[in-house]
């Protein structure tokens, strides 16, 4: 079995209220370091993913973020390639200011478990 070790499903742009974008800026380095340290010796892990369907890549800041994340991963493990799942349709929507993952209507917070 081959494994793509995926770190994030988003960076700065929220898909839902409780997703990783709320803490990305403060935690991405620690989380990548932990993930790579955990899986570095696993022979099934053949590549790393720095994002899945991240619409930020439609903008210069997103391209810079992808480059920064890739360089960081390669500094920790230069033996595996790094990829990101880019959904071009989401990028088009992002360019037009449409957030397909945004919740419709007023936000109603859900209680979080203790």
Question: Can you name each region flagged by the protein language model?
Answer:
Residues 1-114:
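Substrate-binding/catalytic cleft of secreted carbohydrate-active enzymes
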